């Protein structure tokens, strides 16, 4: 059994960005069931919507999102994501992510903002048409060279370990995770009081999907079983 301050399951943009921040506060391990770059992030094209221009605003972006969401969006969540997006983009750029730029009418360099369906303003930051690959490659390079982060590739998260499953008294909480070391054919135990599921979605449960074949909802199932 190996113990860490933080366990991260998944190696896409969510898992890698969390690991880089958490590493300032303790030891981190990332467990991912394939090679680290094979998550859905690398397949993401388009770009990232973020208010960047004077003609745009948070309120306009929120309104566009709510209209496109057709009543399915939680407005508070939408507003939080929209208002925190500029700082998140600055963090990505600090990590070395390069978004496409252009020259304005006065010869100054600026972000080459795109406009996609459902957006009334130009607000899409992109890196050609392979934005996800650019983000993934830069974050993964930083993770691999960070002395406080351990990356376990080909380690399939099998199940969360909870106090209830161990028969311990008190409120049920997660204390670790079982992972299958696919190279060795062994189930290993990772121990931590802080476990973050960054396992993506479950698009592959449907017959027709553009999701990669790893999007099988493993994290969703583990969370449900943990209660």
Q: PLM features: what roles do these ranges have?
A:
Residues 27, 32-186, 204:
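Conserved N-terminal/central alpha/beta ligand/cofactor-binding core
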Residues 11, 155, 193-194:
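Structural detector for helix-capping/boundary residues
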Residues 17, 134, 138, 217-225:
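Short amphipathic alpha-helical face segments that pack within enzyme cores
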Residues 194-227:
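Glycine-rich loop(s) and the adjacent beta-strand/alpha-helix scaffold that form part
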Residues 6-30:
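N-terminal Rossmann-like FAD-binding beta1-loop-alpha1 element of flavoenzymes
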Residues 17-22, 40, 195, 222:
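Hydrophobic/aromatic ligand-binding patch that stacks against planar heteroaromatic rings
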Residues 23, 93, 224:
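Anion (oxyanion) recognition and catalysis
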Residues 2-4, 184-194:
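Core beta-strand elements of the Rossmann-like FAD/NAD(P) dinucleotide-binding domain
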